[in-house]
Regions:
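ATP-dependent small-molecule kinase phosphotransfer cores
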Residues: 25-79, 160-170
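A glycine- and Lys/Arg-enriched "phosphate-lid" helix/loop adjacent to the NTP-binding pocket
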Residues: 42, 89-132
């Protein structure tokens, strides 16, 4: 099963992927993989981020071989995978995390708003009928992993969305 592990930058994707690796998942860091495959096509100086050609990267996704693979990154839901895990986080906690990492104020605000209005969830829902959304705000990384792993993706017929609504934060 090839699973996109996605969410707004700062929600805990890298931390969760480390837990998943301890539980037998192979992890693909999408940003590093894109660079290795020559799919970084530029730099967005305003966002201080690499621009990744996800269409080109999509052609490099390996066929499903039955192993458990997590493609970790905020663009992973744009890849042709089998399912998606979407991590959500209280936007105020997200803003604290991003500020502590030195993100510019405008970028913190942009990601705060993106999380509050479900941008990545909506994009992922458009691509994945097998999707699980969980709120990581009050969960330890191990508990968050369990909340995702306890859902049988193979038999999932419709998205499994834990209730999350932060629109009142805008």
């Amino acid at each position: 099963m090839r699973v996109a592990l996605t969410g707004t930058p700062g929600v805990g994707k890298t931390t969760l992927s480390a837990v998943a690796a301890r539980h037998g998942w192979r992890i693909v860091d999408v940003k590093a993989w894109a660079a290795k495959e020559g799919c970084v096509v530029g730099r967005d100086e305003a966002d201080e981020a690499d621009v990744i050609d996800t269409k080109r990267l999509s052609r490099k996704v390996a066929p499903d071989d039955g192993s458990k693979i997590l493609y970790e990154g905020h663009l992973s839901h744009e890849l042709p995978l089998d399912a998606a895990w979407v991590i959500r986080l209280d936007p105020e906690e997200l803003a604290r995390r991003l500020a502590s990492r030195g993100y510019p104020t405008a970028k913190v605000r942009e990601n705060f708003e993106a999380e509050a209005i479900d941008i990545i969830l909506q994009e992922a829902l458009a691509r994945f009928p097998r999707l699980v959304q969980r709120d990581g705000t009050r969960r330890s990384p191990e508990a968050l992993y369990k909340a995702f792993a306890d859902v049988g993706l193979e038999s999932l017929k419709a998205p499994d969305l834990e209730p999350v609504d932060w629109t009142d934060r805008l």
